[in-house]
Design a protein with these regions (language model features):
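Sec-dependent N-terminal signal peptides
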Residues: 4-13
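Right-handed parallel beta-helix/beta-solenoid
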Residues: 16-30, 37, 45-47, 71, ...
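Beta-solenoid repeat scaffold
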Residues: 20, 37-45, 49-76, 83-94, ...
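Short, compositionally biased
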Residues: 54-65, 111-113, 454-464
Length: 474
């Protein structure tokens, strides 16, 4: 009996997770040789200058390995510091990259070289701020996601002021299934050229491969590096429940097909060049979104649908086909809907076989719809437009009636229930809730918000409900 108890006790000692406190990269390297599932590697508080950290280990689903700050936010990485995360079931928590820069690659990379990528791993509660090269033409990323099933959440990314996308999902021959959520992206100045995206999912070369990445519940404030705030370049991705404030650009479905964009808020606050969603490609669905006070036009319109290039190569513009734009609300935008943008001798294919249904469009600023090129075989139904001139000959499916928009808690809500409540046309079974997460049944309300008193599940994101838990914003 005593022998059995001794063996059990010994097993518990062996299985008990350990904590390793480290003060430099040599100590981290040494710990990586003996770290086991469930262990924690704790970085000592203070300045870590020119620290090239390699977190190369393998945890398990039940027992991930964690690399964390002694106190969240108190480990300051600067100079030429960087981090590579390589292995399965790893967590990085509470780091603060502040005021340094690197020469190439990425500040945080979910791989170690090209041989070992990271899977089922997480970057959380971390800051990268002002990590800018003195030469603004030098291109490196802040976060590069490789592998599969990784998550970046509750991080703060501020003031990337040089060339290169901030966060990139890199594709391979198998889907990624990454999750990017609850982050605060802030203050990206206009670069004056391409390469200033906040998030890019894929590349032109891989744009017809599936990624299944989800970007949700993030807050984007004054992210204006270029015309594409988010650049989709792959297939089967979802962009939902994000909030964009004073961003001079658009969530752009640049390459790839069959993506969903729903439950997002776009607030322009009447700032020049602020935009919403731009559609390129096939099979996209844009629904349950709210667009307010956006001042952009053309590719920066609240909703723009592009022309395409015949026999387009992967890096140009594929014709828009079979898109659905439904149950959105547009309020006080300078250019609410523009169709066929970019039309010229090369971009000669107008959008075809698309549906515009059950949207509320209200504005007194400019024409509600602009056809730069004439769309082909569009289906319009159940829409309520009011305010300015329609801008096109009514194709049917647009009622010119006042929805009586009233501002309630920073959002404009229709008060004329007689023309919107239970008045949606058509059968859109894939839409089962509204922008708030309230249930939609067969008798749906026009616009993004279902009339009723049910609890609101999804609210606009802001600087207080995104980003690191330890970082307080006024």
């Amino acid at each position: 009996m005593k022998k059995t108890l001794a063996l059990i006790f010994l097993s518990l000692i062996i299985l008990k997770a350990e904590e390793f406190k480290v003060s430099n990269t040599d100590e981290i390297k040494s710990v990586m040789k003996k770290v086991q599932p469930g262990d924690r590697v704790i970085l000592a508080n203070g300045e870590w200058k020119d620290a090239a950290i390699v977190f190369d280990a393998d945890g398990t689903k039940e027992k991930p390995i964690t690399l964390c700050a002694e106190i969240s936010g108190k480990v300051i990485l600067n100079g030429n510091s960087s981090l590579k995360i390589a292995g399965d079931y790893l967590i990085v928590d509470g780091l603060n990259f502040l005021g340094g820069y690197i020469e190439k690659g990425a500040v945080i990379e979910f791989r170690n070289g090209t041989k070992k990528e990271s899977n089922h791993s997480r970057l959380t509660n971390t800051v990268i701020e002002n990590y800018n090269h003195p030469d603004k033409t030098v291109d490196y990323k802040w976060v590069s996601l490789y592998g599969t099933h990784n998550r970046v959440d509750h991080c703060y990314f501020r003031n990337k002021a040089y060339q290169g996308c901030l966060l990139v999902v890199w594709l391979s021959d198998k889907p990624n299934y990454h999750l990017i959520d609850s982050n605060y992206f802030a203050y990206r100045p206009d670069l004056g050229n391409n390469g200033g995206e906040i998030i890019r999912v894929g590349t032109s070369d891989w744009s017809m491969y599936p990624s299944y990445t989800v970007v949700e519940k993030n807050y984007f404030e004054q992210c204006s590096g270029e015309r594409e705030i988010i650049s989709n370049k792959s297939v089967y991705n979802t962009y939902r429940y994000n909030t964009f404030v004073e961003c001079q650009g658009a969530l752009t479905l640049r390459h790839g097909n069959n993506c969903d964009v729903y439950g997002n808020y776009f607030f322009g606050n009447n700032v020049k060049g602020t935009g919403g969603v731009r559609i390129i490609g096939e099979g996209h669905k844009v629904y349950n979104n709210y667009f307010q006070d956006l001042e952009g036009e053309d590719a920066f319109s609240a909703l723009s649908i592009m022309n395409g290039v015949p026999n387009s190569p992967l890096n140009r513009y594929f014709q828009v086909k079979n898109a659905v734009v439904a149950f959105n609300t547009f309020v006080n935008n300078r250019h609410s809907i523009e169709i066929g943008i970019g039309k010229n001798d090369e971009l000669s294919l107008p959008p075809i076989n698309c549906t515009i249904a059950n949207n509320i469009v209200y504005s007194t600023k400019g024409k509600l719809v602009k056809n730069v090129d004439e769309p082909q075989n569009f289906k319009w139904e159940g829409n309520v437009f009011f305010g300015s001139e329609l801008g096109i000959a009514n194709p049917g499916g647009i009622e010119i009636k006042d929805p009586q928009m009233k501002k309630i808690h920073d959002l404009f809500i229709p008060q004329n229930s007689a023309i919107v409540q239970n008045k949606a046309a058509g059968n859109y079974d894939f839409i089962v809730e509204d922008i708030d997460g309230q249930k939609r049944d067969q008798l749906k309300t026009v616009g993004c918000d279902e009339m009723g008193v049910a609890k609101r599940i999804h609210l606009p994101m802001n600087k207080k409900n995104t980003g690191p838990f330890w970082l307080k914003h006024d």
